[in-house]
């Protein structure tokens, strides 16, 4: 038994297949009878594969035909409820990007504009006095938020305390309250 090769096993199994008279190959396009006993006279194994008369085709549809109206793509971001630490982490990055773009814009104004930045701030005070406080709040909020969350991360890195999920969520709520108070103070305080 151990001295036989794979060819011995396949040639011994071939006569078992010859006992079948015919078999039917079915697919969606054709149904035909294949006679096995007429073609194979040697001891080689029989091949069971056949070719259909017509090849199978793939039906193509445009992407707008596949969409069902009024259904969002899956998975959609609106079905997820992000936890507070995840939202605060995303907002920390977003405020960092906004502050970097704002400082770059301010540097561009001071370098390439015909007047300095103080002239444009005074122009805002005289021409659009209703926009002074919203503009100050738009600067104070990302600045205080990014600063406070950065301090919280430094405390985490240095002390390795307060890293459980409940402590992160509670410190996040306290931090949001501190940011709201500080940004309101910076909005209404005049620095002259």
From Swiss-Prot:
SUPFAM superfamilies: Fumarate reductase respiratory complex transmembrane subunits
Chain ranges on the Mitochondrial intermembrane side, renumbered to this chain: 114-131, 187-189
Gene3D superfamilies with a match to the protein in the record: Fumarate reductase/succinate dehydrogenase, transmembrane subunit (1.20.1300.10)
Cofactor note: The heme b is bound between the two transmembrane cytochrome b560 subunits.
Single GO MF descriptor: metal ion binding
Record GO biological process: mitochondrial electron transport, succinate to ubiquinone; tricarboxylic acid cycle
Residues bound to heme b: 146
Its membrane topology: Multi-pass membrane protein
Subcellular location per the Swiss-Prot or TrEMBL entry: Mitochondrion inner membrane
TM segment ranges: 84-113, 132-156, 165-186
Names of the cofactor(s): heme b
Keywords: Electron transport, Heme, Iron, Membrane, Metal-binding, Mitochondrion, Mitochondrion inner membrane, Transit peptide, Transmembrane, Transmembrane helix, Transport, Tricarboxylic acid cycle
Gene Ontology cellular-component annotations: mitochondrial inner membrane; respiratory chain complex II (succinate dehydrogenase)
Transit peptide: 1-27
Any Pfam family hit: Sdh_cyt
Pathway in which the depicted protein is active: Carbohydrate metabolism; tricarboxylic acid cycle
Topology feature Mitochondrial matrix, residues: 48-83, 157-164
Family membership noted in the UniProt record: Belongs to the cytochrome b560 family.
Function in brief: Membrane-anchoring subunit of succinate dehydrogenase (SDH) that is involved in complex II of the mitochondrial electron transport chain and is responsible for transferring electrons from succinate to ubiquinone (coenzyme Q).
Subunit: Component of complex II composed of four subunits: the flavoprotein (FP) sdha, iron-sulfur protein (IP) sdhb, and a cytochrome b560 composed of sdhc and sdhd.
Protein name: Succinate dehydrogenase cytochrome b560 subunit, mitochondrial
């Amino acid at each position: 038994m151990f001295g036989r090769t794979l060819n011995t096993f396949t040639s011994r199994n071939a006569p078992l297949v010859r006992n079948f008279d015919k078999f039917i190959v079915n697919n969606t396009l054709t149904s035909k009878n294949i006679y096995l006993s007429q073609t194979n006279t040697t001891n080689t194994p029989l091949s069971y594969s056949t070719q259909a008369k017509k090849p199978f085709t793939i039906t193509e549809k445009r992407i707008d035909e596949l969409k069902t109206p009024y259904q969002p793509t899956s998975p959609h971001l609106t079905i997820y409820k992000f936890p507070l630490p995840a939202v605060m982490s995303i907002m920390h990055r977003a405020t960092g990007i906004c502050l970097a773009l704002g400082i770059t814009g301010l540097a561009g104004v001071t370098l390439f504009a015909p007047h300095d930045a103080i002239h444009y701030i005074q122009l805002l005070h005289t021409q659009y006095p209703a926009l002074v406080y919203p503009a100050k709040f738009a600067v104070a909020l990302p600045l205080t938020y990014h600063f406070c969350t950065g301090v919280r991360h430094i405390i985490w890195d240095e002390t390795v305390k307060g890293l459980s999920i409940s402590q992160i969520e509670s410190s996040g709520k306290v931090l949001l309250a501190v940011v709201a108070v500080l940004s309101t103070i910076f909005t209404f305080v005049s620095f002259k």
